[in-house]
UniProtKB/Swiss-Prot annotation:
InterPro entries: Pept_A24A_C_arc (IPR009639), Prepilin_IV_endopep_pep (IPR000045). The keyword Transferase does not apply. The lineage of its organism: Archaea, Methanobacteriati, Methanobacteriota, Methanomada group, Methanobacteria. Its EC number is 3.4.-.-. It is an enzyme of class 3 (hydrolase). This is Prepilin peptidase EppA. The chain crosses the membrane at residues 1-21, 29-49, 58-78, 80-100, 104-124, 126-146, 166-186, 187-207, 231-251, 358-378. Gene3D superfamilies: 1.20.120.1220. It comes from the Archaea. The gene is eppA. GO terms for cellular component: plasma membrane. It is found in: Cell membrane.
C-alpha cells in the first residue's frame, strides 16, 4: 500500500512539475532552478525510501545511474545547442522521480496491451515521446506567430497550395512508377519490399526527367492501364498521393524557411539583452570575424564542390556561441566592441526561444497512458510491411 502511494506521489509530482515548467516556459521563457533542483532531490529521496522498504538497494542505484546518465546526455545536447539548461534539468527531475515505468494504468486495445513498454529505460521513452510531441507543438506555435505578427510569411507558406498542378503531376508520375514496379516485380522469382521501393524511386526520377511531351504520353498510357486494371485503387491512390505531397510540402515550408523567419528577429547591438540566443555562432579567423550557421551537411557539400576539406574540421575560433543558455553580459560587451571597431555589422539575428517544456509535459502524459511511441511505430511498420 505504501509503495503504491510512493509511486502515485512520484507520478503526481512529475506531472505537476512539468505542468508548472510548461507555464513558466511559455510565460517567462525559463524553467526555474527552484523548481527542478528540489524535485531532483525529492525524486532521489522517494526512490531511496522505496529501496529501503523493498530491501532492494538496486532500485536506488539504478535511479542514481539513470538520473546521472540523463543529465550527462542532456549536457551533451546542451553543448550542441539542442536543449536549454532548464530542459536538461527538467528531464533529470522526471528521471529521478520515475526511473521505471509506473504500473498505474493497464488496458488492451485491438489486441495490444497498453501502455507499450520498451526494452530501454523509461526516461528514454519520455525523451523520445517528448521529441515526437514537439513536432505538432512546433507547427502550432510557428503558425500562431505567422498569423499574429508575421502575416507576410503567409503567402510563402501557402505556396504549395498554389502549386497544386505540379503536385498532381508528381502524384501521377509516382502512380505510374508504382504501376510499372508491380509489372516488373511480377516477373521476378522473389518479392522484396526494399527492392520495390528503390525501383519506385528510380522510375519516378527517370519519368520526371523526361521531356514534357514524352512524359505526358508515357504517364497517360500507364495511368489509363492502371485505371483499367483497378479503377478505385488508382483513383484513391492518386488522390492520397496528391494530398500527401501537398501536406508534406506545407510542413517542409513551415519547418525550414518559414520557421527560420518566424522564430528569428533582427536587432542592433544596443537592443541585445542577457539571455537572448544568437541564431549562429560568431567565429574569428585571423583578423576576420564572421557568423556561420552552416550544418555539417552544408560543409560536406562545400568541401565536395571546392575540394577544400579544411572547413570540415576548422571553422575558426569561436568568439560568441549560439548556445541555448543565451548571451552573457560580457559577450554583449564583446559584440558592442566589435561593432564600434567596424569588425562586424550592427545587425544580429536572434532566435526566439521556443518553449520545450510543454512538449516534455505531453511526452510524459503519453508515456504514462499510451507508452513508447517509437515502439508503437515499429509495430505498425511490421504490420504494414
Amino acid at each position: 500500500m505504501i509503495l503504491m502511494v510512493i509511486e502515485l506521489l512520484s507520478v503526481f509530482i512529475a506531472l505537476l512539475a512539468c505542468f508548472y515548467a510548461s507555464y513558466s516556459d511559455i510565460k517567462r521563457g525559463i524553467i526555474p532552478n527552484r523548481l527542478t533542483f528540489p524535485v531532483i532531490g525529492l525524486g532521489l529521496l522517494l526512490n531511496g525510501a522505496r529501496a529501503l522498504m523493498e530491501s532492494d538497494p538496486w532500485i536506488f542505484i539504478y535511479t542514481a545511474i539513470f538520473t546521472a546518465g540523463i543529465f550527462a546526455l542532456g549536457y551533451i545536447l546542451w553543448r550542441m545547442v539542442a536543449w536549454a539548461g532548464g530542459d536538461v534539468k527538467l528531464f533529470t527531475a522526471v528521471t529521478s522521480l520515475l526511473p521505471f515505468q509506473p504500473s498505474l494504468v493497464s488496458y488492451s486495445f485491438l489486441g495490444t496491451a497498453f501502455p507499450v513498454t520498451a526494452s530501454y529505460p523509461f526516461p528514454l521513452t519520455v525523451i523520445i515521446n517528448s521529441i515526437l510531441a514537439l513536432l505538432p507543438f512546433l507547427l502550432v506555435y510557428v503558425f500562431f506567430i505567422i498569423y499574429t505578427s508575421r502575416r507576410h510569411l503567409m503567402d510563402e507558406f501557402m505556396e504549395p497550395l498554389r502549386q497544386y498542378r505540379t503536385s498532381m503531376v508528381l502524384a501521377l508520375v509516382i502512380t505510374s512508377a508504382v504501376t510499372l514496379t508491380f509489372l516488373i516485380t511480377d516477373f521476378l522469382p522473389f518479392q522484396i519490399i526494399v527492392l520495390s521501393l528503390i525501383l519506385v524511386y528510380l522510375l519516378t526520377m527517370v519519368i520526371s526527367r523526361l521531356p514534357p511531351r514524352i512524359k505526358a504520353v508515357i504517364v497517360s498510357v500507364i495511368i489509363v492501364y492502371s485505371l483499367y486494371k483497378n479503377f478505385e485503387l488508382t483513383v484513391s491512390g492518386v488522390v492520397i498521393l496528391w494530398v500527401s505531397i501537398t501536406v508534406i510540402q506545407l510542413i517542409r515550408k513551415l519547418l525550414t524557411s518559414i520557421t527560420r523567419e518566424a522564430l528569428q528577429d533582427t536587432m542592433g547591438v544596443d537592443e541585445l539583452k542577457e539571455g537572448m540566443i544568437l541564431a549562429s555562432t560568431l567565429y574569428r579567423k585571423g583578423d576576420e570575424y564572421y557568423f556561420d550557421d552552416s550544418s555539417l551537411l552544408d560543409r560536406f557539400r562545400t568541401a565536395a564542390r571546392t575540394g577544400d576539406v579544411s572547413a570540415l574540421t576548422y571553422r575558426g575560433e569561436p568568439v560568441v556561441s549560439a548556445m541555448a543558455a543565451g548571451l552573457r553580459e560580457e559577450e554583449i560587451e564583446t559584440l558592442r566592441d566589435l561593432v564600434s571597431r567596424g569588425k562586424i555589422k550592427d545587425e544580429f539575428r536572434i532566435r526566439r526561444g521556443m518553449p520545450f517544456a510543454p512538449a516534455i509535459f505531453i511526452g510524459l502524459l503519453v508515456s504514462l497512458l499510451i507508452g513508447d511511441l517509437a515502439m508503437i511505430l515499429f509495430r505498425l511498420f511490421d504490420i504494414i510491411f
